[in-house]
Amino acid sequence: MTKRTFGGTSRKRKRVSGFRVRMRNHTGRRVIRSRRKRGRARLAV
């Protein structure tokens, strides 16, 4: 069986797809809006 190779880095994840990064531009705000509309518990990472 193969190993799980994805480690995941908290800082990188926040910088790429955190809430404040999403709010910076129009498309990011659209993502937040659509997730709010859908009723997601977590809007961003």
From Swiss-Prot:
It comes from the Bacteria. InterPro entries: Ribosomal_bL34, Ribosomal_bL34_CS. Keywords: Ribonucleoprotein, Ribosomal protein. GO terms for molecular function: structural constituent of ribosome. Signal peptide: none annotated. GO terms for biological process: translation. Pfam families: Ribosomal_L34. GO terms for cellular component: ribonucleoprotein complex; ribosome. Belongs to the bacterial ribosomal protein bL34 family. NCBIfam families: rpmH_bact. This is Large ribosomal subunit protein bL34. It comes from Prochlorococcus marinus (strain MIT 9313).
